[in-house]
Regions:
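Terminus-proximal functional modules
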Residues: 1-64
Length: 64
């Protein structure tokens, strides 16, 4: 039997000087308690600039 997955993407905007990593950690802790697992990140940047947004991709098995 093949495992079916559901996915979630969390996005975070760059703050005044940095990303709020403490908030990201809190969010991941809550999601982990709900069965979500972070499986990837995206930090797109345009040109020579710094990424202004990051995304965390999570998945968890879908219950039948």
């Amino acid at each position: 039997m093949t495992t079916r997955w559901e996915h979630k993407v969390l996005t975070y905007k760059l703050g005044w000087k940095a990303f709020d990593y403490a908030q990201i950690e809190r969010d991941l802790t809550v999601l982990g308690g709900e069965g979500w697992e972070a499986v990837g990140t995206l930090a797109p940047s345009f040109g020579a600039g710094q990424a202004i947004e990051i995304a965390v991709i999570a998945k968890r098995p879908v219950g039948d």
